Regions:
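Residue-level marker of alpha-helix boundaries and capping positions
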Residues: 34-35, 113, 154
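Conserved active-site region of classical short-chain dehydrogenase/reductase
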Residues: 120, 162-165
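Cofactor-binding loop segments of dinucleotide-utilizing enzymes, especially the Rossmann-like FAD-
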Residues: 12-14, 115, 156
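Hydrophobic/small residue at the entry helix of a nucleotide-binding pocket
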Residues: 159
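Glycine/Thr-rich phosphate-binding loops of Rossmann-like dinucleotide-binding domains
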Residues: 19, 99-100, 162-163
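FAD-binding core/adjacent interface of flavoenzyme oxidoreductases
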Residues: 45-151
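Short, hinge-like loop/turn segments at secondary-structure boundaries
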Residues: 26-30, 129, 152
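Beta1-alpha1 glycine-rich phosphate/pyrophosphate-binding loop at the start
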Residues: 1-60, 165-170
Length: 170
């Protein structure tokens, strides 16, 4: 926006939120930040009203034509496909958490925390009847019906350390 105040800018985000405090996610899981909405920094309307940026959440780029300078977008809620033209294209596809190929890595009670919905899912799992809400009653291996007492945090970066700190509070 600083380079050209009149440029048409389109920002596409696959998830439901455009801008959130990812360092606050562990504190939301731990209860220090009780309201999920407190994690949100800016909304679609904030980008539109303050920065004149057309921001589309729950939308995914499913095709790029460099020859025609167009992108094909899919609305993840409605399934509708649209085509938009561009002069300059900036790719910022984000990241995905690394899930090591360990036996049981996809069982209930194993979480990645990178987005607001990830933190919501973990917090809900911690606060509800784990056996029924998580689907653990469908497994024949180790099952828990009591509140979890132990946790393992894989990753010693800021988020991992803050997650360990906040799980102690639970």
């Amino acid at each position: 926006r600083r380079l050209d105040e009149s440029a048409e800018i389109l920002m596409v985000e696959r998830g439901p939120y455009v801008s959130f405090a990812n360092c606050g996610l562990p504190y939301h899981v731990g209860g220090s930040i009780p309201k999920e909405s407190s994690l949100l920094v800016a909304t679609e309307s904030t980008f539109r009203e303050q920065f004149a940026i057309d921001c589309r959440t729950q939308c995914e780029v499913v095709g790029v034509s460099t020859e025609h300078k167009t992108i094909e977008l899919k609305n993840l809620v409605t399934g509708e496909l649209t085509t938009e033209r561009y002069d300059k294209l900036v790719l910022s596809p984000g990241a995905a958490p690394i899930r090591p190929p360990l036996p049981g890595i996809d069982l209930p009670g194993i979480f990645s925390v990178r987005t607001v919905p990830d933190a919501r899912h973990m917090r809900q799992w911690l606060e509800r009847d784990q056996a029924k809400q998580s689907g653990m009653d469908q497994y024949t291996g180790f099952q828990t019906v009591t509140r979890p007492q132990r946790a393992v945090v894989v990753g010693g970066g800021f988020i991992g350390l803050e997650m360990a700190e906040n799980l102690i509070k639970r």
